[in-house]
Amino acid sequence: MAKILYMVVEHFKNQDAVAVYRRFRDCGRMAPEGLVYVSSWVDEKLERCYQLMETHGRALLDEWMGNWSDLIDFEVHQVVTSQEATKKIAPRL
């Protein structure tokens, strides 16, 4: 089974980045085995994080989000790389 990339947009509840970073410092990412962190970016106001995650299925992602749902509202998008998108669109060009 191929791995799936997910772009996860994390909206920090009450714009409280301190609570999120404190938990991360104390507990780590709290990701279940099989869910791989790829990279992340945080907006300048420290209100949201754009995080790229990789796994074989959505269940592990849902489990991980459950560990953070008291501090973060999540928006999830399944994504492909630009190279994969180019291959998908090529027959239509």
What do the PLM-derived regions correspond to, one by one?
Residues 51:
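Extracellular/luminal beta-rich ligand-recognition
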Residues 71-82:
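Conserved short beta-strand edge segments in small beta-sheet-based binding/regulatory domains
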Residues 65:
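Short, flexible helix/strand-to-coil boundary loops that buttress conserved ligand/catalytic motifs
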Residues 1-48, 56-60, 80-93:
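Short S/T/G/P-rich N-terminal loop/turn motif that feeds into the first structured element of a domain
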